[in-house]
Amino acid sequence: MGSRYPSHQLSNGLFVSGRPEQPKERAPTMSAVAMPYTGGDIKRSGELGKMFDIPADGTKSRKSGPIPGAPSRSGSFAGTAQSGPGAPMATGRMSGSLASAGSVSMKKTNSGPLSKHGEPLKKSSGPQSGGVTRQNSGSIPILPATGLITSGPITSGPLNSSGAPRKVSGPLDSSGLMKSHMPTVVHNQAVTTLGPEDDFSCLKSFPKPVLWLVVLIFIMGFLAGGFILGAVHNPILLVVVAILFTVVAALFIWNICWGRRGITDFIARYPDADLRTAKNGQHVKVTGVVTCGNVPLESSFHRVPRCVYTSTCLYEYRGWGSKPANSSHRHFTWGLRSSERHVVDFYISDFQSGLRALVKTGSGAKVTPLVDDSVVIDFKQGSEQVSPDFVRWLGKKNLTSDDRIMRLKEGYIKEGSTVSVIGVVQRNDNVLMIVPSSEPLAAGWQWRRCTFPTSLEGIVLRCEDSSNVDAIPV
């Protein structure tokens, strides 16, 4: 008996209504490899790397032309791209127009010749499938190896455009990044550069009119004593003047040699103030542990990082036929040939109150440093105990040794050192600061050391040699 509705029999013998289903082409099965961990490497991040125009690893090969054994698939698409190093086919840039509607084959097309790393030598931009056009104008920004997009040009900082450390001249060590950063730090306005005139000297604060008056009195005394000795043959006046001259000369020599020791004793006896009760504008002495501010320093010779004060001075001894180190260098004395002394703002944690204060020693502030030298190296050409580090440092600074007798002195205050600071308290918007004083601090006579009265200008920094002492970690 016929029926208006068509029916068909299934494979199990059951009759159902409707026409039999047309056999469909089975969709191709594509296997995918699990993406490995890239570790943040932008060169191994597939599509993100292509977006920023970064080539893949050189070990991956690129192929041009149709994929062998790729089945056709219905739909409109412009090709596929596999990302990551685990894909069976390496990534490539798509250029040109691919077939749109209908059954098309999956293709990857690279235009132009390939380099030895499998990378197109010439990038081309053109219309994509589906009428979508991609145009690149100008240079595409390059990401560092970390894949982080940050503000500012990529050339600023210790990394180059590929994310690797910048190459600097000289031997490479663990502080290579700081070496490339040091020239910008030294010329920073926040760094105070100290000269020879900023160093402490007892004779610098001695009144010059008094000094010349004493010299004039002794000259007149010697002339009068010599005249009396020649006229009446009486040497008493000449002997008295000679004894007084010897005493005064010995006192001056003593102050030149031991005047610094006297002023350090004065600072040690100066009472520490409590920052909690210190008034605004009060002269205080604070002792505590220092912490670097925004601009840390590095010593020139030993490359000690994270310092708040550095001093590297090269001296030369001028003999009878030696060359002068500077224009005012006299014979048979040590003259300053090279000086690198810098200080910046830093923080100090007071031992008594526990408060943290900002010490304003940077930005051209007046500072009187009393820091012991951590390194003293004597150099003489032809000596068997010549330091190779010292010779290398001379070459880096473009300083010749010749046959000169030289001495290198380096001192520094590194982070975590214990420092005594004398300055004026200033409170500004709940920020506790120690700033330079407008008037010098008078030390007066130091009878225990037999030193002349002297004065200390600006902020006084006192730190003993801490090269052999472990700094407090901060």
Curated annotation (Swiss-Prot):
InterPro entries: At1g16860-like. Residues 1-14, 73-83, 97-113, 125-137 have a biased composition (Polar residues). This is Uncharacterized membrane protein At1g16860. The lineage of its organism: Eukaryota, Viridiplantae, Streptophyta, Embryophyta, Tracheophyta. It comes from Arabidopsis thaliana. It comes from the Eukaryota. Residues 1-137 are annotated as: Disordered. GO terms for cellular component: plasma membrane. Keywords: Membrane, Phosphoprotein, Transmembrane, Transmembrane helix. It is a multi-pass membrane protein. The modification Phosphoserine is found at S45, S169. The chain crosses the membrane at residues 210-230, 236-256. One of its GO terms (biological process) is negative regulation of cellulose biosynthetic process. It is found in: Membrane.
